[in-house]
Amino acid sequence: MANIKSAKKRAVTSEKRRKHNASRRSMMRTFIKKVYAAIATGDKAAAQNAFNEMQPLVDRQAAKGLIHKNKAARHKANLTAQISKMA
């Protein structure tokens, strides 16, 4: 454990941010899983609705630096391709 006052504060702040980021990342993954689940059921309308809910959330997390912008783009591109392949 840190001995210097500023290092102690950084440790506390860092842990607080880690928990906050973990929560945001978990929420984002849940929304992505909802899209995959909708695709698995074969319901294109439900998949599109789930994607429309997921897209701004992923973009926001990328803009805030939680994930890299290319990772956000990759998720969106893969899911869009899978949805468009549906009958």
Swiss-Prot record:
Any GO CC annotation of this UniProt entry: cytosol
Record-given protein name: Small ribosomal subunit protein bS20
Family as reported in the entry's similarity comment: Belongs to the bacterial ribosomal protein bS20 family.
One BP annotation, GO: translation
InterPro entries membership: Ribosomal_bS20 (IPR002583), Ribosomal_bS20_sf (IPR036510)
Disordered: region residues: 1-27
The organism's place on the tree of life at top rank: Bacteria
NCBIfam families: S20
Free-text function comment from the UniProt entry: Binds directly to 16S ribosomal RNA.
GO MF terms held by the record: small ribosomal subunit rRNA binding; structural constituent of ribosome
Species in which this protein is naturally found: Erwinia tasmaniensis (strain DSM 17950 / CFBP 7177 / CIP 109463 / NCPPB 4357 / Et1/99)
Keywords for the protein's UniProt record, in alphabetical order: Ribonucleoprotein, Ribosomal protein, RNA-binding, rRNA-binding
